[in-house]
Amino acid sequence: MKYDIIGDIHGCFQEFQDLTKKLGYNWNSDLPIHPDQRKLAFVGDITDRGPHSLRMIEIVWELVINKKVAYYAPGNHCNKLYRFFLGRNVTIAHGLETTVAEYEALPSHQQNMIKEKFITLYEQSPLYHVLDEKRLIVCHAGIRQDYIGRQDKKVQTFVLYGDITGEKHADGSPVRRDWAKEYKGTAWVVYGHTPVKEPRFVNHTVNIDTGAVFGGKLTGLRYPEMETVSVPSSLPFVPEKFRPIS
């Protein structure tokens, strides 16, 4: 099986459509379908900050749950939106406010449909995907070699948030260790979460979050070819979001 793994979309539907067309998908049925049966895989954070979060929920639900032709691994923004939809007390900030505003503008019956679709998508998707006979891992923020196969709380925190130290940067964002430098596994780990200006290959890991929602690019990785394909963002460039990884 051949896959096209898509970085953090964050509600950037137009960039997602542009990227999938560039990857050879057609949209004749209002969904990206590849003529050679390649499958899309999403590294999570499909919503928040960008203009079309609900459209992305509907597309990913349709591909993953209804048609079963794609894979989705949730990100930290997905986890927070899931908790919001469950009625938990979450802070509506850091991008969630844009998704909530879209949601609250809908009539109640459409709100219920979107909520049910996202809850189903989240609950029926694993924390990370192990594909191609264990040669490929698709996850949100990365995974240590010794965590592969585990689902416990420590692994969940790592996969959703990265290798956080507990410290904070001046802007309040968490300080993260560069786990990829220590990765010695043979499986390719394809992930996102931390915006980088260019796809970052370190050992057998690839970070494909090129900051589409921050004016960078939306990137896909073609597997097993290991080629990256990107399209430019239509949004303003926010340089401080592309912090050096340390």
From Swiss-Prot:
It comes from the Bacteria. Its EC number is 3.6.1.17. One of its GO terms (cellular component) is cytoplasm. Its cofactor is Ni(2+). Keywords: GTP-binding, Hydrolase, Nickel, Nucleotide-binding. Asymmetrically hydrolyzes Ap4p to yield AMP and ATP. Belongs to the PrpE family. This is Bis(5'-nucleosyl)-tetraphosphatase PrpE [asymmetrical]. The lineage of its organism: Bacteria, Bacillati, Bacillota, Bacilli, Bacillales.
